């Protein structure tokens, strides 16, 4: 649940269990849950281990978000995506650049390729290069010593130095000006989304170009985006996406509910059908946020 109201928290029974999301932006909610004595779990903190894959809400929802971002961009784009050769002439394929090659980014690359676009992508993690290229995308990246250690143990991107960000900005400027569509998916857990596209870079794009910023709710990868708003910047349409999976709700709800059901299977004894939580389980320890009127996760203390 996201941003629980005071009434909803007051209605919770002491010692009850609850799953929450958007935990980094819910400090007030966390403190209220702690004071109430509610045991809460943040499903987004699910460890990146094989046993937890079926419970990973980030992966299931991000997969849909990456797909829908490209579909929305295609709808807004006033040209065709694939190359078409006709008796009346040839239509050049659209050029799509994806920022961030996590689950959402990789799905965006795959979807854009299936629609016939020429796709490039950028990420700070060297591990992403092979994944991007395996999907037919061109990998655009500043390769230096810092990129060798740009990934956390959980598989997420780390925040990079200002020097690296400057190098990256210069490289992106060279590439972005020729792109028709930019899909922004880069996030850093617990921190504001990295700024990857400046206003000057937006102005360098061709009129009619589209930017879909999936990171808008976390500050945005594009300087010109705002969550829930669509802005026109010198002919470039900038969409600050807000809860994009709600626009593909049937599949999003189906996957999310299955993730939660699989997590509940972990908490409930298969024989007695009663709650039986192993507090030493790696998954439980990884996503536990509040218990016994304490915040248990070090990230939020």
PLM region spans:
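Single conserved hydrophobic/aromatic residue that forms the stacking wall/gate
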Residues: 1-15, 20
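Alpha-helix C-terminal capping/helix-to-coil transition sites in glycosyltransferase folds
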Residues: 14-15, 177-178, 206-207
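Rossmann-fold NAD(P)-binding glycine/threonine-rich loop
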Residues: 24-48, 192-243
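Generic hydrophobic/aromatic pocket-lining and core-packing "Φ" positions
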Residues: 30, 70, 108-109, 129, ...
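A structured beta-alpha segment of the ubiquitous adenosine-cofactor-binding alpha/beta core
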Residues: 150-182, 186-203, 241, 249-254
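Adenosine-phosphate binding glycine-rich loop
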Residues: 44-87, 216, 222-301
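Glycine-rich phosphate/diphosphate-binding loop of Rossmann-like nucleotide-binding domains
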Residues: 82-175
């Amino acid at each position: 649940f996201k941003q629980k109201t005071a009434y909803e928290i007051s209605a919770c029974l002491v010692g009850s269990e609850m799953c929450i999301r958007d935990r980094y932006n819910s400090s007030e909610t966390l403190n209220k849950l702690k004071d109430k004595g509610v045991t809460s779990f943040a499903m987004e903190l699910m460890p990146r281990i094989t046993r937890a894959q079926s419970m990973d809400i980030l992966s299931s929802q991000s997969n849909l978000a990456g797909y829908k971002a490209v579909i929305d961009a295609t709808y807004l784009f006033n040209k065709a995506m694939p190359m078409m050769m006709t008796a009346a002439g040839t239509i050049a394929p659209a050029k799509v650049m994806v920022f961030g090659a996590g689950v959402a980014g990789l799905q965006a690359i795959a979807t854009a390729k299936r629609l016939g676009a020429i796709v490039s992508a950028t990420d700070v993690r060297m591990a992403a290069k092979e994944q991007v290229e395996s999907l037919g995308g061109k990998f655009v990246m500043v390769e230096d010593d810092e990129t060798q250690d740009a990934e956390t143990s959980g598989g997420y991107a780390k925040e990079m130095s200002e020097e690296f960000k400057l190098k990256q900005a210069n490289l992106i400027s060279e590439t972005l000006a020729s792109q028709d569509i930019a899909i922004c998916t880069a996030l850093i857990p617990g921190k504001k989304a990295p700024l990857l596209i400046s206003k000057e870079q937006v102005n360098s794009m061709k009129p009619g170009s589209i930017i879909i910023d999936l990171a808008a709710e976390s500050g945005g990868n594009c300087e010109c985006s705002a969550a829930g708003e669509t802005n026109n910047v010198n002919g470039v349409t900038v969409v600050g996406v807000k809860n994009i999976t709600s626009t593909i709700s049937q599949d999003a709800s189906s996957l999310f509910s299955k993730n939660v059901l699989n997590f509940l299977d972990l908490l409930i004894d298969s024989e007695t059908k009663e709650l039986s939580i192993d507090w030493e389980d790696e998954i439980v320890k990884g996503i536990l946020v509040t218990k016994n009127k304490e915040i248990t996760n070090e990230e939020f203390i």
